[in-house]
Curated annotation (Swiss-Prot):
CDD domains: S24_LexA-like (cd06529). GO terms for molecular function: DNA binding; serine-type endopeptidase activity. It catalyses: Hydrolysis of Ala-|-Gly bond in repressor LexA. The record marks A90, G91 as: Cleavage. It comes from Ectopseudomonas mendocina (strain ymp) (Pseudomonas mendocina). InterPro entries: LexA, LexA-like, LexA/Signal_pep-like_sf, LexA_DNA-bd_dom, LexA_repressor, Peptidase_S24_LexA, Peptidase_S24_S26A/B/C, WH-like_DNA-bd_sf. The gene is lexA. This is LexA repressor. Belongs to the peptidase S24 family. Keywords: Autocatalytic cleavage, DNA damage, DNA repair, DNA replication, DNA-binding, Hydrolase, Repressor, SOS response, Transcription, Transcription regulation. It is an enzyme of class 3 (hydrolase).
Length: 204
């Protein structure tokens, strides 16, 4: 398989996640919504590029006609463990290869919902709920979050772990340490992306 761009790798990871979680691949519209494309046509162009590189196979005329050669949901991830993500570069996808420090041999299904990666925690802003500097945070990738959940959020290209609270167009990213003030986000003026939910912590 030819080398993928960061965006192509992100799409491939989303397809695998849908196969793992649902048993079937996403539609073009679902890919466009997940990745923030303006239309399914943009997703189609990326899928064609992935097919040219041998990463996927496409069935013409089928909305979910995407398969990954040799990919068996559940089998590969359990053998390979979970990628450990270190410092995330501004603007780059979290699962971009340059962020992967190592692999941790733990079954993703140990967590619920299933973990997609482990994020190395930086700092002590969440210490009051037992998340410390250097811990590995198990993260389930999703763009949705409910009030009170612990999220991995990307704000103006910086990735942070905080408790999520939303009221209308305002979001607060709240630390679990009184030394850190809540981060107030105006969704009409700032770019906030939910990268995933905390589903567990590993201390080494």
């Amino acid at each position: 398989m030819l080398k993928l761009t960061p965006r192509q790798a992100e799409i491939l990871a989303f397809i695998k996640r849908c196969l793992e979680d649902n048993g079937y691949p996403p539609t073009r519209a679902e890919i466009a919504q997940e990745l923030g494309f303006k239309s399914p046509n943009a997703a189609e162009e990326h899928l064609k590029a992935l097919a040219r590189k041998g990463a996927i196979e496409m069935t013409p005329g089928a909305s979910r006609g995407i398969r990954i050669p040799g990919f068996e949901p559940g089998a590969a991830n359990e053998d390979e463990g979970l990628p450990v993500i270190g410092r995330v570069a501004a603007g780059a996808p979290i699962l971009a290869q340059q962020h992967v420090e190592e692999s941790c041999q733990i079954n993703p299904a140990f967590f619920h919902p299933k973990a997609d990666y482990l994020l190395r925690v930086r700092g002590m802003s969440m210490k009051d709920i037992g998340i410390f500097d250097g811990d590995l945070l198990a993260v389930h990738t999703t763009r949705e979050a409910r009030n009170g959940q612990i999220v991995v959020a990307r704000l103006d290209d910086e990735v942070t772990v905080k408790r999520f609270k939303r009221e209308g167009n305002k979001v607060w990213l709240i630390a679990e340490n009184p030394e850190f003030a809540p981060i107030e986000v105006d969704l009409e003026q700032q770019d906030l992306v939910i990268e995933g939910l905390s589903v567990g912590v590993i201390r080494r």
